[in-house]
Amino acid sequence: MTVTRPRAERGAFPPGTEHYGRSLLGAPLIWFPAPAASRESGLILAGTHGDENSSVVTLSCALRTLTPSLRRHHVVLCVNPDGCQLGLRANANGVDLNRNFPAANWKEGETVYRWNSAAEERDVVLLTGDKPGSEPETQALCQLIHRIQPAWVVSFHDPLACIEDPRHSELGEWLAQAFELPLVTSVGYETPGSFGSWCADLNLHCITAEFPPISSDEASEKYLFAMANLLRWHPKDAIRPS
């Protein structure tokens, strides 16, 4: 069996998508169950921040490139479809979803981020939500994870150019080699109410994969086969990083 589909067939997704909820503005929240699912299946996420689209495009390309029957891991291509549609980091309520998860360290009030990679200050204000897990996108993702019980999660972001894995695991090392990014145990600042914090409360292994500042076009060329190999990764198979 060939590992990849012919390029001419990659313009559309293979069948098999499901809905796990709706966004604040009513967009369907879509996930891609793994055709070759097992107890060892993980979950791969992108699009938590709507202004971070290079990993969304690359993950989409990988989903359409890999032969579907080889995919071992579940995918949520876009956690925040309203933000992606509007080009916002936040959801349509102005809430940073990565500060809204019902983690023990959630903090009420405001959070700040950098306008872009050239900005020196974190001075753009977003909200963390009225309460932990207040947003429909957050609630739906938490429910999905409780339902499918993934063995691990890899959450894609940008532009910090690193693989953050507090456990320094075999998968973390593989990701660092495959994507040619440094492996770190922390991004260096507090992230109260983040998805990773919530996963830590559940003892669910979460790795945050941060692309560098990169265009979608370049990312889909540079990282396509690393992403496709992640979709079928298994430690026993010793899949080469690239």
Swiss-Prot record:
An example molecular function term from Gene Ontology annotations: murein tripeptide carboxypeptidase activity
Alphabetized CDD domains for the sequence: M14_MpaA-like
Cellular compartment(s): Cytoplasm
EC class of the enzyme, as a word: hydrolase
Single Gene Ontology BP annotation: cell wall macromolecule catabolic process
Transferase is among the record's keywords: no
Cofactor binding mode and count: Binds 1 zinc ion per subunit.
EC number(s) from the headed UniProt entry: 3.4.17.-
Cystine pairings recorded for this chain: none
Keyword match Ribonucleoprotein: no
Enzyme active site: E210
Residues the record lists as binding Zn(2+): H49, E52, H157
Pathway membership, UniProt: Cell wall degradation; peptidoglycan degradation
CC cofactor: Zn(2+)
Coiled-coil portions: none
Keywords associated with the record: Carboxypeptidase, Cell wall biogenesis/degradation, Cytoplasm, Hydrolase, Metal-binding, Metalloprotease, Protease, Zinc
Catalytic activity: L-alanyl-gamma-D-glutamyl-meso-2,6-diaminopimelate + H2O = L-alanyl-D-glutamate + meso-2,6-diaminopimelate
UniProt cross-references to NCBIfam families, sorted A to Z: PRK10602.1
Homology family: Belongs to the peptidase M14 family.
Matching HAMAP family: MpaA_carboxypeptidase
Physiological role: Involved in muropeptide degradation. Catalyzes the hydrolysis of the gamma-D-glutamyl-diaminopimelic acid (gamma-D-Glu-Dap) amide bond in the murein tripeptide L-alanyl-gamma-D-glutamyl-meso-diaminopimelic acid, leading to the formation of L-Ala-gamma-D-Glu and Dap.
Binding partners and assembly: Homodimer.
Protein name, per record: Murein peptide amidase A
Originating species: Escherichia coli O157:H7
